[in-house]
């Protein structure tokens, strides 16, 4: 699964370096076997953003992208759109959304996002948002895709703050930014992904990869 993620990330020509950040010797061994650059990080990190921050302490860059190893359907196009978003003035944190499929609308493992007219995230939730009270069919639901881009000051700030109440409740680390007034800008992509969090997710991904769609 990691190989799919690495190769998709490596295909993005705008990235200077692709580094696997891990606290797992098993993953490090896979990296050595394939000749991939990797960094061993602390096993104490509570989130992927904390792990990216540790790497950012040692490697200077304009923008840091986080692509999670459980996203085997990652595509170069995801990263291209995200990097374009980060070129806008004032964007410190960026991520992606895609129209939510009917089966994911009520799935708590598929995180939903609501955005303002200017693309800033208003909220992320495992619940169905927005809620279509009158069942009008006019409420558009968007799924959040777990790709992130950060500038260093935003990473520094995130790691200086404790976990927020909303973050603990939803188990969504990005809510820490919103709780502290840091805007997360969201770009839209037509390319959905399936993060592998459960056995059912794994079966879905295997079926998609088998058909090549």
Please give the residue ranges for each predicted region.
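Conserved alpha/beta core of the MobA/IspD/sugar-nucleotide pyrophosphorylase nucleotidyltransferase superfamily
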Residues: 17, 139-213
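N-terminal glycine-rich phosphate-binding loop and ensuing alpha1 helix
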Residues: 1-21
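Short phosphate-binding loop-to-helix
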Residues: 19, 25-84
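Hydrophobic/aromatic residues located in beta-strands of well-ordered beta-sheets
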Residues: 18-20, 64, 121, 184
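Short, high-confidence coil segments that cap the C-terminus of an alpha-helix
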Residues: 15, 61, 88-91, 182
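Class I S-adenosyl-L-methionine
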Residues: 10, 28-32, 37, 178, ...
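Conserved core of the sugar-phosphate nucleotidyltransferase
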Residues: 74-164
């Amino acid at each position: 699964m990691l190989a799919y993620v690495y190769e998709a990330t490596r295909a993005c020509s705008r990235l200077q370096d692709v580094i696997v950040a891990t606290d797992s010797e098993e993953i490090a061994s896979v990296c050595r076997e394939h000749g991939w650059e990797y960094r061993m990080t602390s096993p104490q990190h509570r989130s992927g953003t904390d792990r990216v921050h540790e790497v950012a302490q040692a490697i200077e860059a304009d923008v840091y992208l986080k692509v999670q190893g459980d996203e085997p359907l990652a595509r170069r196009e995801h990263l291209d759109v995200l990097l374009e978003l980060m070129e806008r003035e004032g964007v410190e944190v960026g991520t992606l959304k895609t129209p939510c499929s009917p089966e994911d609308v009520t799935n708590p493992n598929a995180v939903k996002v609501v955005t303002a007219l200017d693309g800033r995230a208003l909220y992320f939730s495992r619940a169905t948002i927005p809620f279509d009270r009158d069942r009008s069919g006019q409420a558009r639901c968007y799924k959040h895709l777990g790709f992130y881009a950060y500038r260093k000051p935003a990473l520094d700030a995130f790691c200086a703050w404790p976990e927020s109440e909303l973050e603990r409740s939803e188990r969504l680390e990005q809510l820490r930014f919103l709780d502290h007034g840091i805007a997360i800008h969201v770009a839209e992509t037509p390319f959905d992904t399936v993060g592998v969090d459960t056995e059912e997710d794994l079966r879905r991904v295997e079926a998609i990869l088998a058909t090549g769609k």
